[in-house]
Amino acid sequence: MVVDKNNHQIISEKNLIKDISAINYDQSINVVIEIPLGDDQKWEVSKFDGNLKHEFFMGKPRLINYSPYPVNYGIIPSTVSSIELGGDGDPLDVVFLGKKRDRGDIIKAKPIGVLKMRDFGDKDDKIIAVPNTEKFLTINSLEDLNNKDLEELEKIKSWFQNYKGTNIVEFIGYGNKLEAEKIINTSINHYNKYGIKFF
């Protein structure tokens, strides 16, 4: 990847949406990291060219006006949260637990659940995923995670519920691993059938 500081973007050899599969042969998912743990810069993968770009607001690079991200944040490539099904038309969001990763990293992960939210009325599901490393080998569900660290999910939920301000993002509830897998498969099928719309 090439960092283009003048244009506030990271240029990838691959289109980070179209050229990477959502699911691997071992049923792990691929996650593209947009915002590392502890970061306050709002970046996203562009739907137009698949490169990572710093979002702009009122002519300036966007920063989160809240505490930094409590978790690595990114997308599952080759997916879309369908507008027709109440989503926002973007690739499926992922919160990725574990150590801090670099922006643009592509990581194999295992989904263990879903954080269900609404953002300005749009469905804004966020898949909860963990790495398949020694620390997380026994974490295969939200129950496993709670048994290991009861505060982790609450910390993540509270952050996403409040970082945009009061009464903007609504927490709907949690979904288990099977529900997360169903959401992922639906988003893959919709992407394969319709692709991503640019508006």
Regions found by a protein language model. Give the residues of each.
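Hydrophobic N-terminal alpha-helices or hydrophobic patches in metabolic proteins across all domains
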Residues: 1-199
